[in-house]
Amino acid sequence: MAHQAHPFRSVLYIPGSKERALEKAQGLAADAIIFDLEDAVAHDEKIHARALLKTTLETVDYGHRFRIVRVNGMDTEWGRADLEAFAEAKADAILIPKVSRAADLEAVAALVPDLPLWAMMETAQGMLNAAEIAAHPRLTGMVMGTNDLAKELGSRYRPDRLAMQAGLGLCLLAARAHGLTIVDGVYNAFKDEEGLRAECEQGRDMGFDGKTLIHPAQLEIANAVFSPSPAEIELANRQIAAFEEAERHGQGVAVVDGKIVENLHIVTARQTLAKAEAIAAFRAS
């Protein structure tokens, strides 16, 4: 897991063309917001959305929410102008769509020299090149684009996301190998709370830092699922205490609840506590 000073349990897409949605986002319980200029904006609204979002980011206070701008691709008529407009914007990262190889990030890096870059992982080629992409020195985050990936694969939706497992796993491996944040794809049925919870739990258990969301109604479940539970925090504290006590007696392992606790378990326990502390700090900010 990447060491984060900021949680990414809930990452909400907001269309850059919708002024009311941009205003409402100030009060939402999202850890991060993706201000979208790409898929969520119609072609005839692209230029308006760019201007509206630029002004909004300059004038609206989103508190400590992590602000990500998803631009249009460099192969479109809007991509370069998007990057030029937001190169020095009040954003925390620029999200590049449909990254298929590390070279896709080079032109963007030149136009946006100061902001961190995130990559949308949503093509078959991107899955196969995930390690190369994750190694790019400017990249700090990955976002799974499961809708576009499903379209490219020609796969049908199943609750276990069987067709997605290979791609999700490759991107997770790449992100963890290079210390990146990585968030899972969206769940389209925003009124299906049971289905959303199950998919959030699957993503959490796989190792994702959080989930991208398409509707504010999904925030509560994502935040809950991707937060360490009181039981997990209590266990982490007991594991650390038992291991430190064992070390004081010259032992390299401890036993907690009938299970061996080694150094690798302590690393995980400390990560659990660090995540809980980051969430608490974010809530208090």
UniProtKB/Swiss-Prot annotation:
Positions of Mg(2+) binding: 122, 148
Q: Which Gene3D superfamilies match?
A: Phosphoenolpyruvate-binding domains
What are its E.C. numbers?
3.1.2.30
Q: Which cofactor is essential here?
A: Mg(2+)
Superkingdom, natural source: Bacteria
| Entries under Pfam families matching the protein | HpcH_HpaI
Q: Does the keyword Magnesium apply?
A: yes
GO terms for molecular function, please? hydrolase activity; magnesium ion binding
Alphabetized UniProt keyword annotations: Hydrolase, Magnesium, Metal-binding
Q: What class of enzyme is it?
A: hydrolase
Work out whether the entry's keyword set contains Signal: no
Could you tell me what reaction this enzyme catalyses?
A: (S)-malyl-CoA + H2O = (S)-malate + CoA + H(+)
| One of the GO BP terms on file | oxaloacetate metabolic process
Q: Quick one: which residues bind substrate? A: 70, 122
Functional summary from the UniProt entry:
Catalyzes the hydrolysis of (3S)-malyl-CoA to (3S)-malate and free CoA. Inactive towards beta-methylmalyl-CoA and other CoA esters.
Q: How does it assemble?
A: Homodimer or homotrimer.
State the similarity comment. Belongs to the HpcH/HpaI aldolase family.
What name is this protein filed under? (3S)-malyl-CoA thioesterase
Originating organism: Cereibacter sphaeroides (strain ATCC 17029 / ATH 2.4.9) (Rhodobacter sphaeroides)
